[in-house]
Swiss-Prot record:
GO terms for biological process: rRNA base methylation. Belongs to the methyltransferase superfamily. RsmH family. Residues 291-315 are annotated as: Disordered. Keywords: Cytoplasm, Methyltransferase, rRNA processing, S-adenosyl-L-methionine, Transferase. It is an enzyme of class 2 (transferase). This is Ribosomal RNA small subunit methyltransferase H. The gene is rsmH. It comes from the Bacteria. Its EC number is 2.1.1.199. The lineage of its organism: Bacteria, Bacillati, Cyanobacteriota, Cyanophyceae, Oscillatoriophycideae. It is found in: Cytoplasm. It comes from Crocosphaera subtropica (strain ATCC 51142 / BH68). S-adenosyl-L-methionine binds at G61, G62, H63, D80, F108, D124, Q131. One of its GO terms (cellular component) is cytoplasm.
Length: 315
């Protein structure tokens, strides 16, 4: 099998054009990830022949693949900050022999999009399931790993840096604002007393001790909100989302649609009000689209997903 990867430097990111002339009917590669709300995304984008679409959170390429399957002349530009996700996506689409995907490595808020470039845009926010399932990335408290949580391995700020060096007040504010954690002050106080922490499991155990025993073993782990807050802070997720929401409507052709999947209220509120207040967009979904019970049963991680759509106004 012969792969061609042509790269061109683009400020601090890389544009990667992936092509493969062999095995066009290759079966699905083993690393392909099935995203949430598949049919709802495809229906909402209203994909057109010869359209150009932006997958702003490429990951393992699940949504991109669904878009490309709609018509043989559809093209997709995919964005991802995670170098490991990019590498796996390269392998996936090369094995499938699909030449219609371009990948731009970087933060979606920094993408230099052109006015009217895309027929549609999709963004699936947060951490993907494969990232959670790789222990050494440090996103999950269910695996012992270093306190990392970086999407971009080249940046210096890690979860360990925050936990072990921020002052108590700053930690409490972080847990409350980004994790909506009501016990934020008590948790911050305990962590400052017990630090330094080196691993995810060590940190999760310390957080759990801030809760009454009967609340430590419920459906939602006591450390969930703190870990969410740390991940958001490490990767500037909300700041990046706000910048993306400001830029993305300009990249749509008239009538083009943008859909965003969020997984917690901090993201969803920003998407909701950005769509509502935009002078360029008409809201399509008055209420968010949520997974059907069958999908939640097959994929429990989908249960908190909310999908909102808006459409670019005519000129």
């Amino acid at each position: 099998m012969y792969f061609i990867f042509s790269t061109a430097s683009l400020s601090s990111v890389t544009l990667i054009v992936m092509t493969n002339t062999d095995h066009p009917n290759q079966p699905n590669p083993p690393h392909l990830h099935t995203p949430v709300l598949c049919q709802e995304v495809i229906d909402g984008l209203a994909i057109e022949p010869n359209g150009h679409y932006l997958d702003a959170t490429l990951g393992r390429g699940g949504h991109s693949r669904l878009i490309l399957e709609a018509f043989p002349d559809v093209r997709v530009t995919g964005i991802d900050l995670d170098e490991e996700a990019i590498a796996i996506t390269q392998e996936n689409f090369s094995l499938m022999g699909d030449k219609r995907l371009q990948v731009w490595q970087g933060n979606f808020a920094d993408y230099p999009g052109e006015i009217g470039e895309f027929n549609g845009i999709i963004a699936d926010l947060g951490v993907s399931s494969p990232q959670f399932d790789v222990p050494e990335r440090g996103f999950s408290f269910r695996h012992q790993a270093p306190l990392d949580m970086r999407m971009n391995r080249e940046q210096s700020l890690t979860a360990g840096e925050i936990i072990n060096h921020w002052d108590q007040t700053s930690l409490a504010d972080l847990f409350y604002q980004y994790g909506e954690e009501r016990r934020s002050r008590a948790i911050a106080r305990r962590l400052v007393q017990q630090r330094p922490f080196e691993t995810t499991t060590e940190l999760a155990e310390a957080i759990a001790k801030c809760f009454p025993p009967k609340q430590r073993y419920g459906r939602i782990h006591p450390a969930t909100r703190v870990f969410q807050a740390l991940r958001i802070a490490v990767n500037d997720e909300l700041g990046s989302l706000e910048r993306f929401l400001e830029k993305a409507p300009h990249w749509l052709k008239p009538g083009g649609r943008i859909g965003i999947i969020s997984f917690h209220s901090l993201e969803d509120r920003r998407v909701k009000y950005s769509f509502r207040d935009s002078l360029l967009l008409d809201v399509i979904t008055k209420k968010p689209i949520i997974p059907q019970p069958e999908e939640e049963e097959k994929n429990p991680r989908s249960r908190s997903a909310k999908l909102r759509f808006a459409q670019r106004k005519p000129l």
